[in-house]
């Protein structure tokens, strides 16, 4: 899906020497746009902190507080060090999903490259956290409780862990890309009132997919923190 926006044209020209497709360049452009927007919102919210929050500070405290509560409920106290990572991913995925509801914009999460990058971050973080917590004993997570089944369990666990980034990326990509295609069809058939319910459903889908991505990231990291049996 191509949109003749100036910043998209800029990124296409900028990335042309790398032979990146227009769809890939657009996804990169929207990704950077979202990053800049989140940074600006963060700066505005923290520019003049007050004991009694108002405006943007109040809004961001509600959002961040909600994510923090979910991290604590899912991972407990030991999940607090990983709250910044999980909150960053959750906000990025959510805003990436919602931006597609703005006419003329396309969600970067409807591009497989973006969702794969987010999934790889979760995958690497999971194992880095596990190795940092348990050292070489982290390998026991892949061996299972019965020593003579260790080779078979290791093979099965490796496949299971490698499938995680695949399922994370494909689930988010499939849902967001599918919604965009349905929305395009409805806009083509009836560009006025009919697409409105689909856009409202898009808000719900955006929140659900961001929540699922965040929840799975928490579960994977939580699993790497647990002692192997």
From Swiss-Prot:
GO CC field: plasma membrane; proton-transporting ATP synthase complex
Topological relation to the membrane, as annotated: Multi-pass membrane protein
Biological processes, Gene Ontology terms: proton motive force-driven plasma membrane ATP synthesis
PROSITE patterns cross-referenced by the UniProt entry: ATPASE_A (PS00449)
Pfam families: ATP-synt_A (PF00119)
Alphabetical UniProt keywords: ATP synthesis, Cell inner membrane, Cell membrane, CF(0), Hydrogen ion transport, Ion transport, Membrane, Transmembrane, Transmembrane helix, Transport
InterPro entries attached to this UniProt entry: ATP_syn_F0_a_bact/chloroplast (IPR045082), ATP_synth_F0_asu (IPR000568), ATP_synth_F0_asu_AS (IPR023011), F0_ATP_A_sf (IPR035908)
Subcellular location: Cell inner membrane
Molecular function terms from GO: proton-transporting ATP synthase activity, rotational mechanism
Transmembrane segments: 25-45, 86-106, 111-131, 142-162, 181-201, 202-222
Family: Belongs to the ATPase A chain family.
Quaternary structure and interacting proteins, as annotated: F-type ATPases have 2 components, CF(1) - the catalytic core - and CF(0) - the membrane proton channel. CF(1) has five subunits: alpha(3), beta(3), gamma(1), delta(1), epsilon(1). CF(0) has three main subunits: a(1), b(2) and c(9-12). The alpha and beta chains form an alternating ring which encloses part of the gamma chain. CF(1) is attached to CF(0) by a central stalk formed by the gamma and epsilon chains, while a peripheral stalk is formed by the delta and b chains.
PANTHER family with a match to the protein in the record: ATP SYNTHASE SUBUNIT A, CHLOROPLASTIC (PTHR42823:SF3)
Protein's recorded name: ATP synthase subunit a
Organism: Geobacter sulfurreducens (strain ATCC 51573 / DSM 12127 / PCA)
């Amino acid at each position: 899906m191509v949109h003749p926006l100036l910043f998209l044209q800029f990124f296409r020209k900028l990335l042309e020497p790398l032979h990146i497709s227009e769809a890939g360049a657009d996804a990169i452009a929207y990704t950077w746009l979202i990053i800049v927007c989140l940074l600006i919102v963060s700066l505005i919210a923290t520019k003049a902190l007050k004991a009694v929050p108002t405006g943007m500070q109040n809004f961001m405290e509600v959002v961040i507080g909600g994510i923090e509560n979910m991290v604590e409920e899912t991972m407990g106290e030991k999940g607090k060090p990983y709250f910044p990572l999980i909150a960053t991913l959750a906000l990025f995925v959510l805003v990436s999903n919602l931006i597609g509801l703005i006419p003329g914009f396309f969600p970067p999460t409807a591009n497989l490259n973006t969702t794969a990058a987010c999934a790889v971050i979760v995958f690497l973080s999971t194992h880095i956290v596990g190795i940092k917590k348990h050292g070489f004993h982290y390998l026991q997570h892949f061996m299972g409780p019965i020593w003579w089944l260790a080779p078979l369990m290791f093979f099965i666990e490796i496949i299971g862990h490698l499938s995680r980034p695949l399922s994370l990326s494909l689930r988010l990509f499939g849902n967001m890309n599918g919604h965009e295609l349905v929305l395009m069809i409805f806009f083509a058939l009836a560009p006025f009132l009919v697409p409105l319910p689909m856009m409202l459903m898009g808000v719900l889908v955006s929140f659900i997919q961001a929540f699922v991505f965040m929840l799975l990231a928490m579960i994977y990291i939580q699993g790497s923190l647990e002692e192997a049996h």
